[in-house]
Structure formats: C-alpha cells, structure tokens
Design a protein with these regions (language model features):
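N-terminal beta-alpha lobe that positions the nucleotide/phosphoryl donor
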Residues: 1-177, 186, 263, 276, ...
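Structured core elements
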Residues: 7, 28, 111-113, 125, ...
Length: 423
C-alpha cells in the first residue's frame, strides 16, 4: 500500500492525483533543485480514511445532492465539525507525527497548509479559500491544524467557490503540506509574465500572509526578462507580521525602505523563469526571504491577458493609480463599501470600491464589473481569483473610498492599474 506521508523530495510526491497540485508543484521544484522549505506531503487518502472512520461519508454526499438547502447546510456542518473534532485514525496519526517531529516541534516552528486535489489548477486556483496554519510548535497544535485543514474543505467559503465552478466536495479530497516555517524578514509574490511581457514582484516585511490576504500595500517591482528593475513603487511600512505571534512596528527610518535589493530581485526573476519551465507556462509564485536566502512557497499556472486601449473620453477625467490584477477592463457605477457587512448594497454590474480586498470577497466577484481596493497588491489571493474570473481589479489605490464618489461612473483598467471616474 502506498505511503500516506512522503517527503517532498520523493518522486511520488509530484503526483497531483494523490497530493494535490500545490504539493505536487512544490515537489517538482524540490526535485529540480530549487529552494523550497523542507517538508512532507500527506496523501489525500488520509483524508478519505478519516472521513470513513468517522462515519461522515453519507453527510458529505448530502451537501450537493440534496435540494433541501437547510438539509444541505446541516450535512456540511456535520461533516466539518466531525472532521474537526474526531480523533485521527491511529496509523495516520503515527505517520503524521513521525513526519512532523523530523522537521518541527521542540522550539522549531512548522506550518500546515492545504493542498486540495482541486486546488492550484488552471481555472480553479482556490486562492485563499482554504487554510494555512503558521508557527506551530507542539504536537497537539499540529494535529489540530491537520484536522482544521481537512475541515476547511467544508467551509462556507469553499463550498460557495465549488458551487460556482460546478464541483462537489464529496468527489474530491484534501491533501496536506507539512513544512518548516521560514522566519521571513520579507515575503510576497511574483508574476513571471505580465500583459506587457515583463515580470512583477510584490514584497512586504515579515511573513507573507499579509500580502496574500490583501491587508497591506506591498512594494511593487517591475522587472525586464533579464531580471533588471524597470520600475519600482515602495510602500509605506508601519508594521510587519512576524514569527513572534503578532505584528512588530517599524521605526520611522524604515517606513519607505525597500524590502529587496537589485541582486535579490534578479534571483527571484531567475527562479520565476525556472518555475515557468516546471509548470509549463507563465507562473505565479509565493516566496519568503530569511537569513539563509530566498525560498519558494508556492508556484501555480498564471493566466496572462492582453492590454486594452482605453476610450479617449476617459483620459479627460480624474484618475488614480494602483497595483493591477493583470486582466480586463470594466466600467460601472461605483459602490463604496467600508466593511463586508455592507456587501449587500453592491448591485449587479457595479464597481466595488473598498478598503481591504481579502479572499472573503470572492463570493461577490461573479456579480461585479470590477473591484478597486485601497490595500493589497497584484499577487494577493483576491487578485488571483479576479484573474481566474476575468474581473478587472486595481489594488493599493490609496484613498479610493474617499476620492471616488459613491454612485459615480467608474472605469477600471485591470492591466495598466488606472482607475478613472466621472460624475
């Protein structure tokens, strides 16, 4: 019987049908000699063993098979809580702890990351729809994180995403990544190819979660194909997500300091070129830098759009610049929303103007013509979802909720990163 937990360096780890595309892509990077944190991947079979042992298979099948919505919600909740609270099957638990103790624990923090079989594929990235757990140190916390990753397949957010893509949770499974935590001094993402043929890097101090969740405006670097800096926009840095279980404040002297130098950017460009070879085309990456250098945390296929020429009428109106998602042109009535509780105010075809563009907004993407956000960058999870759906988005647009009048007509260029409006 195949092993349920295998190191990323094992040839079998590159099988997406067992370990999901996220883990399989990382395994391919490891086997190509690229810098990836040490770790293991957990076969999706472990999830299926657990589901069966807990008697949850019938509840799982009832989520999308039932036309009774209250019944479907009850089935989803039963499955989620069962996976979260149930004891892990002994043979699976033993294999998990053996892998975990070899790379983390006893003061060595580790991470547990989702790698669903439907994740990180072309057309369904699931960016930000599942969970990752950082800075885990004890066996108990590790096992809790594993159960939480399995249960995340049945979260409301994931179920909605699957429904819009015609997927059924009962037909898929959750594999898992176990890795050493990179105590990052800086982290972010990168796009190996933009609409204009350049490369793009986002960076922020500390761990990369703040960039992925769209909670900060990151540094933005545009590189040529040789990795030389063509353009840079440095963000103001007030705090960083650190490995000390919180945020650390910055001294005023570091507010505008770059996160990366030219040599580090050239190294990232080279790594993105190699990732393109492995994923078979343009790639989107996540990375982190500590005292030992740059590590790759993720690589997935990237859809690249062509630039559009704006109508000259828009050039006469006021505009703001930001970080483009890299796809699309959209127009519509602006709907300024300051918190998620106001999303019901956003009508079909309107342009959502908001502060934080987090993955929770993914459910509204099918209904809007474009999104403008004050925080976030081109490599955030929501930007990935916007590219996937062809929704124009510009992030890091400072003062957007104050400058763009609610109800005004707005044009959003998701390729150039320009937002214009007229009364």
């Amino acid at each position: 019987m195949p092993r349920v937990v295998v190191p990323l360096s094992a040839p079998e780890a590159a099988d997406p049908s067992r370990f999901g595309a996220k883990a399989a892509n990382l395994a391919a990077l490891v086997q190509a000699g690229l810098p990836v944190p040490a770790g293991f991947c957990v076969d999706a079979r472990a999830y299926r063993i657990q589901l069966s042992a807990l008697g949850l298979e019938e509840s799982a099948r009832g989520v999308f098979s039932s036309e009774d919505r209250p019944c479907a919600r009850r089935c989803a909740l039963e499955t989620k809580l069962g996976l979260m609270q149930g004891a892990i099957v002994p043979e699976v638990r033993e294999a998990l702890l053996s892998a975990w103790r070899s790379i983390a624990g006893e003061g060595r923090p580790g991470v547990v990351r989702s790698s669903a079989l439907v994740e990180d594929r072309a057309g369904s990235s699931f960016a930000g729809q599942f969970q990752s757990y950082l800075e885990l140190e004890s066996d108990e916390d590790f096992l809790t994180a594993v159960r939480a990753c399995w249960a995340a397949l049945w979260s409301t957010r994931a179920l909605r995403y699957m429904a819009t893509h015609g997927l059924d949770c009962a037909d898929t499974a959750m594999a898992i990544l176990i890795q050493r935590l990179v105590p990052a001094g800086a982290a972010g993402g990168g796009l190996s190819r933009t609409a204009s043929g350049e490369m793009l890097v986002n960076a922020a101090p500390g761990l990369g979660a703040a960039v992925a969740q769209g909670e900060v405006v990151p540094d933005r670097y545009v590189l040529d194909r040789a990795g030389r800096v063509k353009e840079s926009a440095l963000a103001q840095k007030y705090h960083a997500l650190s490995c000390a279980h919180g945020r650390r404040a910055f001294s005023r002297a570091l507010f505008g300091a770059p996160c990366l130098d030219a040599e580090q950017l050239a190294e990232l460009a080279l790594l993105m070129h190699k990732c393109e070879e492995i994923v078979g085309g343009p790639a989107e990456i996540e990375w982190a830098r500590d005292d030992t250098g740059i590590s790759l945390l993720q690589a997935r296929p990237l859809a690249v759009a062509t630039a559009q020429v704006p109508d000259e009428i828009w050039l006469k109106h006021p505009g703001l610049n930001g970080h483009p998602s890299g796809i699309g042109w959209g127009e519509g009535r602006a709907r300024v929303v300051n918190c998620e509780c106001e999303l019901e105010r956003v009508g079909p075809g309107e342009v959502l103007v908001t502060t934080v563009a987090g993955p929770a907004l993914s459910e509204i993407l099918p209904h809007v013509s474009a999104v403008v956000a004050e925080l976030g960058g081109s490599t955030s999870h929501l930007a990935s979802l916007a590219r996937e759906r062809g929704v124009p988005m510009v992030l890091g647009v400072l003062d957007a909720t104050r400058r763009i009048p609610d109800g005004s007509t707005v044009a959003v260029d998701g390729v150039s990163g320009v937002v214009r409006w007229m009364q």
